[in-house]
Amino acid sequence: MAGSGGLGGGAGDLQGAGTGQGTALRALRAPLALVVLLLSAYCLFALPGRCPPAARAPAPVPAPAEPPHTSLRLRAPGLPVASGPGRRRFPQALIVGVKKGGTRALLEFLRLHPDVRALGSEPHFFDRCYDRGLAWYRGLMPRTLDGQITMEKTPSYFVTQEAPRRIHGMSPDTKLIVVVRNPVTRAISDYAQTLSKTPGLPSFRALAFRHGLGPVDTAWSAVRIGLYAQHLDNWLRYFPLSHFLFVSGERLVSDPAGEVGRVQDFLGLKRVVTDKHFYFNATKGFPCLKKAQGSGRPRCLGKSKGRPHPRVPEAVVQRLQAFYRPFNRKFYQMTGQDFGWD
């Protein structure tokens, strides 16, 4: 009987313990669910490098019978323009770089041209979303008529190792536009953008030099992007130099019509976008587009364009200029252009 009583007491203890554990688990369930919800939201919205949601892309279109790439030349004068909404095509031209070089400005200026149709957002297909496939990528593109050029811009392509090979696989005839800027001012602008989104960031100097005092830290992306010659070496393994146009980010500000004119020539377009389309906004220190007929006001780029840069000590600037000088000179030799950064 004593044994029976002992077993009975043990069962009671287990039942009580089970009840206590169930209560504790129920008490933990709500905060655990909240943690999971918050982590899911963070992964969805905060983590970098995400592809555009597939649901936002139009349904993939079947491959056309003819080659997807049309000539960059304009249609002959007098020929009728194809009627209807047109077709989605792979881009014949890409703005592949560089970040904080002036790529958004160039794209907006080119969109004034009636024979240019450009995707407004950056699809990041050849760096982040390649596994979604070419049909998905083409489905993102705006519809174009025969004789119009499809374009997109994603500045990170220029510094992505796999991008040249992937773009060449899409079409070896792709025209490539690279907007470059003094790598020192580009790095400071890059830092300013990051600082605006991440208050409390270490100083520019602390990030640019190892331990703030040592050699230049090329592991920091703001520094590494400016090694233009190294990145171009990778691209020239797949495309000849004749497929590139290098646009000066500085001249895009001081002479937008001149630089956009060079781009129109490169694409085989008539020079439709000219100096009559621009005016200089002294407040922003940046060119803006004059208002179109029927429009209430001129168009300037977003408020982030022309944001003031943080003050960087002159000694830091000089050290970076000295670091970039040999890379700049090699880039001048490779492109046949002197951008005047030294």
Curated annotation (Swiss-Prot):
It is a single-pass type II membrane protein. Its EC number is 2.8.2.23. Residues 56-75 are annotated as: Disordered. Its main location: Golgi. Glycans are attached at residue 281. Residues 50-342 are lumenal. One of its GO terms (molecular function) is [heparan sulfate]-glucosamine 3-sulfotransferase activity. The keyword Transferase applies. GO terms for biological process: blastocyst hatching; heparan sulfate proteoglycan biosynthetic process. Residues 1-31 are cytoplasmic. It is found in: Golgi apparatus membrane. Disulfide bonds join 288-300. The chain crosses the membrane at residues 32-49. Substrate binds at residues 122-128, 153-156, 220-221. Expressed in liver and kidney, followed by heart, brain, lung and testis. 3'-phosphoadenylyl sulfate binds at residues 100-104, 181, 189, 305-309. Keywords: Disulfide bond, Glycoprotein, Golgi apparatus, Membrane, Signal-anchor, Transferase, Transmembrane, Transmembrane helix. GO terms for cellular component: Golgi membrane. Belongs to the sulfotransferase 1 family. Sulfotransferase that utilizes 3'-phospho-5'-adenylyl sulfate (PAPS) to catalyze the transfer of a sulfo group to heparan sulfate. Unlike 3-OST-1, does not convert non-anticoagulant heparan sulfate to anticoagulant heparan sulfate. PANTHER family: HEPARAN SULFATE GLUCOSAMINE 3-O-SULFOTRANSFERASE 6, HEPARAN SULFATE SULFOTRANSFERASE. This is Heparan sulfate glucosamine 3-O-sulfotransferase 6. The lineage of its organism: Eukaryota, Metazoa, Chordata, Craniata, Vertebrata. The gene is Hs3st6.
